[in-house]
């Protein structure tokens, strides 16, 4: 890890640094998180680390135990499915409302299309570089673009907690699937439907996209066995 700067936002930076390590798999389920070591690696005091650990605990990425202290939360596919179910509903609604808006606000169409294509290009570049964290960041950016176009601020707010948790699920999937390009083909199809103002198609594609993501997660879990509660209990 690189030393962090900008003291006013240190706790948020520590949060993101640790979350990225969990998402990337560098910090695995059950691994202890000693605040002194995290602070030393990041070049910060313990206070922002403590604050970050509270946020990580609230988002389900870290668990605090009286006996074990702080450790990376186990991978829970059933809980992941619940998060995917809610995100699916939000993403379907967002795609439909975004397409409806662009169907009568043609001034925005070319701008949104350009922004979307830029994110698609970055996502595909991240695949070619085998950069999982960057792939997830671009994936999240794409969906937040759709939230923004839908012009419903409650969508992004409601989706935030699910995205924080599902970033980890996405990391697990991307480490174990052979064709992440399919994800970006689906994004491209959603974008196309949105900019064409085809609300029914956009909604269906968004729902199918989240459903396939959930399916990939469970296939990876079944095929190779991702870390779970039992694994953690044996450590």
Each model region followed by its residue ranges:
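Hydrophobic residues in alpha-helical segments
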Residues: 22, 98, 102, 123-127, ...
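A short secondary-structure junction motif
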Residues: 21, 25, 122, 162-169, ...
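Long, hydrophobic, amphipathic alpha-helical segments used as structural scaffolds
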Residues: 98-102, 150-158, 170-177, 217, ...
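Conserved amphipathic alpha-helical segments that form helical-bundle/coiled-coil interaction surfaces
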Residues: 78, 83, 105-171, 185-189, ...
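Short linear motifs at protein or domain termini
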Residues: 1-104, 218-235
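C-terminal regulatory/effector modules of DNA-binding transcriptional regulators
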Residues: 41, 174-235
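Hydrophobic recognition helices of helix-based DNA-binding modules
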Residues: 18, 94, 98, 146-150, ...
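Short helix-capping and inter-helix turn/linker motifs at the boundaries of alpha-helical repeat units
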Residues: 9, 114, 133, 178-181
């Amino acid at each position: 890890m690189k030393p962090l700067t900008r003291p006013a936002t240190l706790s948020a930076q520590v949060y993101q640094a640790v979350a990225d390590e969990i998402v990337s798999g560098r910090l695995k389920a059950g691994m202890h998180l000693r605040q002194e070591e995290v602070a030393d690696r990041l070049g910060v005091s313990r206070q922002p680390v403590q604050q970050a650990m509270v946020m990580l605990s609230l988002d389900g990425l870290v668990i605090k135990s009286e006996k074990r202290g702080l450790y990376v939360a186990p991978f829970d596919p059933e809980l992941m499915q619940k998060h995917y179910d809610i995100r699916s509903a939000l993403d379907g609604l967002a795609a439909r409302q975004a397409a409806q808006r662009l169907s009568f606000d043609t001034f925005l169409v070319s701008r949104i299309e350009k922004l979307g294509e830029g994110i698609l290009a970055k996502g595909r570049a991240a695949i070619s570089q085998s950069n999982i964290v960057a792939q997830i960041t671009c994936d999240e950016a794409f969906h937040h673009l759709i939230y923004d176009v839908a012009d419903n601020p409650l969508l992004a707010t409601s989706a935030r907690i699910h995205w924080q948790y599902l970033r980890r699920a996405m990391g697990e999937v991307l480490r174990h699937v052979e064709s992440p390009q399919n994800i970006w083909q689906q994004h491209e199809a959603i974008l196309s439907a949105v900019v064409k103002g085809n609300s029914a198609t956009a909604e269906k594609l968004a729902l199918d996209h989240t459903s396939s993501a959930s399916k990939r997660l469970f296939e990876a879990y079944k095929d190779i066995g991702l870390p779970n509660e039992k694994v953690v209990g044996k450590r």
